[in-house]
A protein has these predicted regions:
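Conserved phosphate/anionic-ligand binding catalytic regions in large, soluble enzymes, centered on
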Residues: 97, 102, 201-213, 282-285
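Non-catalytic accessory segments adjacent to catalytic cores
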Residues: 2-122, 164, 197-199, 217, ...
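Contiguous alpha-helical scaffold segments within structured protein domains
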Residues: 54-80, 115, 176, 183-274
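Short coil/turn segments at secondary-structure boundaries
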Residues: 104-109, 140-146, 250-251, 266-268, ...
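Short, flexible beta-strand-to-coil junctions
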Residues: 1, 28-33, 144-148, 290
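Conserved hydrophobic core element of enzyme catalytic domains
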Residues: 241-337
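Short conserved micro-motifs at the rims of enzyme active sites and ligand-binding pockets
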Residues: 37-39, 180-181, 215-216, 329-332
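An anion-binding catalytic pocket shared by soluble metabolic enzymes
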Residues: 107-199, 214, 220, 291-321
Length: 338
């Protein structure tokens, strides 16, 4: 398809010059949050649109048969912020932001970085294969390659979707890392009894209900909580659903971005992120938004959050990872979560 960079969500080209509806995949960077008047480190990451020209389908078996299994060497690998420095940031956020009433929870990231010692596209397809084979419970497993930029990941979380007028949000929070022998009833019960994990989930659900009320005429309905099991982690989640007649681009704008990867309240969270994170987020915590034409007119929207995603630019690998900080957070424990 054709690659088009646009300035605003409303500029995403859902129709051609003759008004014919088109399918578009948009990579929405975190910096688009300025459309809501919120703060951010502006890194000029483009709102990049792939206007779909052709679509092909493969079975998983056929895809795996064609994807490479190369060993991808990484050099100078490690976190850009070490454990002690990250723990210091956590302490400051708890004391200076949460302790002074700026909000109840904030997500602060650091980046795992390395130099990729092979062709970036080969590396991306190799990692994509590994995710297809070994990760489970992902909402989207994807690779997006555009000029000078590659993204590959397995996002567990749908931020927002709009299918036939039904809007769905899926807040996921709380993270249980499976022990070496696997999860047991006892370890899961301990996780579910954690005050910190419970606070995280309730706070993000409350914030997303506010978003639903802004885009849905009926305000939305809530179901859950549920457990979401992945290959090495288990999360807690809720499902929120409501109805809306809004343009899907407007739905996306009014729900930027998920409190599960920013914090709450949303505006304060963006200010705290700008104050305490040392570099721009790029696409981390943004979305990959797929707009698909409906037979009766309009477009459906499917927008997973861009987390659990690796980016390669100019041969440099970056994997942004964050932890949700609440008043009960342990600074070193949050570093371990990343």
């Amino acid at each position: 398809g054709e690659i088009v960079d646009v300035a605003l969500l409303g500029d995403i080209p859902l129709h051609d010059a003759e008004g014919v509806a088109r399918e578009v995949l948009a990579l929405v960077p975190f910096r688009q949050v300025v459309e809501r008047g919120f703060a951010c480190h502006d890194d000029a990451a483009p709102l990049r649109c792939l206007v779909v020209g052709e679509r092909h389908s493969l079975s998983l078996a056929d895809a795996l048969a064609q994807l490479p299994t190369d060993r991808i060497p990484l050099e100078d690998a490690g976190f850009d912020i070490d454990d002690e420095a990250y723990a210091d940031i956590v302490r400051r956020v708890i004391a200076d932001e949460i302790g002074r009433g700026e909000g109840a929870n904030f997500v602060i990231r650091r980046d795992y970085v390395a130099q990729v010692g092979s062709d970036p596209l080969t590396a991306g397809f190799t990692w994509f294969r590994a995710l297809l084979e070994h990760e489970r419970g992902a909402y989207w497993t994807f690779l997006v390659s555009t000029p000078d930029h590659l993204a590959v990941g397995a996002s567990p979380e749908a931020h927002v979707s709009a299918q036939g007028g039904v809007v769905t949000m899926n807040p996921i929070s709380g993270t249980f890392r499976h022990p070496a022998g696997g999860a047991t009833a006892e370890t899961l019960t301990e996780f579910l009894s954690s005050t910190k994990e419970t606070e995280e989930l309730f706070m993000v659900v409350d914030e997303e209900l506010k978003m639903m009320s802004a885009v849905c005429s009926d305000g939305g309905r809530i179901t859950g909580p549920h457990l979401k099991e992945m290959s090495r982690l288990t999360h807690t989640e809720y499902m929120l659903r409501g109805t809306s007649t809004m343009d899907p681009r407007d739905i996306l704008r009014e729900t930027m971005f998920a409190p599960t990867v920013t914090g709450s309240p949303m505006q304060n969270a963006c200010t705290v992120i700008a104050r305490h994170e040392q570099s721009p987020r790029g696409y981390y915590s943004g979305v990959a938004a797929l707009f698909t034409p409906r037979a009766g007119g309009g477009h459906d929207l499917d927008a997973p959050i861009l987390i659990r995603t690796a980016y390669v630019v100019d041969g440099r690998l970056r994997v942004p990872v964050g932890a949700t900080l609440v008043r009960h957070s342990d600074p070193y424990g949050e570093g371990g979560e990343t």
